[in-house]
A protein has these predicted regions:
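Hydrophobic side chains in well-ordered alpha-helices
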Residues: 37, 61, 95, 117, ...
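Short clusters of hydrophobic/aromatic residues that line enzyme substrate/ligand-binding pockets
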Residues: 38, 62, 86, 194-196, ...
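Glycine-rich anion-binding loops of enzyme active sites
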Residues: 1-66, 187
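Internal active-site segments that recognize and position negatively charged phosphoryl groups
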Residues: 49-53, 88-113
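Phosphate-handling active-site elements
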Residues: 35-39, 70-75, 127-128
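Active-site glycine-rich loop that binds ribose-phosphate moieties when present
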Residues: 27-39, 77-98
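Glycine-/charge-enriched secondary-structure boundary and capping motifs
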Residues: 1-13, 18-22, 29, 100-101, ...
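Short, compositionally biased
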Residues: 61-77
């Protein structure tokens, strides 16, 4: 926390970081001009759904910390990387700032991709079709069974990557600015619900 606060020149003045008899919760409110607002509620049909970085690393790091991850598949370097992703996530501030004026809707992935993307869909009154094969995995996660890595990427939290929707043209511009950092994983649809393509090539709801 101290490292990140120093890097981004902010003051850490509290939070749920210690134990004690008294807990004080503070909300910070600010102002932003209308043209600079990035909301969850503005996704449009045919928008591409994108994420930054790699997904599932923090959840894998947590499973390792809890002794729930198969250790024979990964090296010590892999474990160090996964724990760093869990304990010291990288804020995507630079990309987030560039989304203003290019993305229609955005959210950080703290509760897992499916849960957080669903916030965008509910707020926007839209649906989504996801390409599961396009989920971005780190080299460490690629060493795990595909089904396990996919589950971690879809439902694991604490990645703090960004999920956003934008037109194909604006996604292309963002990819030029941030090569290898932005991955298209699906498309916004007018029909509500979240679907993926199964092994038979059929679209199936995640709830099924």
């Amino acid at each position: 926390l101290a490292y990140i606060a120093k890097k981004y020149q902010i003051q850490l003045v509290g939070g749920d970081t210690t134990r004690g008899p008294l807990t004080i919760t503070i909300q910070v409110h600010g102002h932003v001009t209308k043209q600079n607002i990035l909301q969850r509620s503005a996704a449009e049909s045919t928008d591409l759904i994108c994420v930054t970085g790699c997904l599932g690393d923090a959840a894998a790091g947590l499973q390792f910390r809890l002794g729930q991850l198969e250790t024979g598949l990964l090296t010590d370097t892999d474990f160090e990387y996964l724990l760093q992703r869990l304990e010291m996530p990288t804020p995507r501030n630079q990309i987030g700032q560039q989304l203003v004026g290019k993305a229609h809707a955005a959210i950080d992935i703290s509760d897992g991709l499916l849960a957080d993307l669903n916030h965008i869909l509910n707020a926007s009154g839209k649906g989504a079709k996801l390409d599961i094969s396009a989920l971005p995995f780190s080299d460490a996660l690629k060493k795990l069974p595909t089904e396990m890595a996919t589950q971690l990427a879809l439902t694991g939290g604490d990645d703090y990557e960004l999920c956003f929707t934008a037109t194909a043209g604006n996604v292309a511009k963002l990819k030029q600015q941030f090569p290898e950092m932005i991955q298209v994983i699906g498309e916004i649809t007018e029909d509500v619900g979240m679907f993926y393509q199964n092994a038979q090539g059929e679209w199936q709801a995640f709830s099924e």
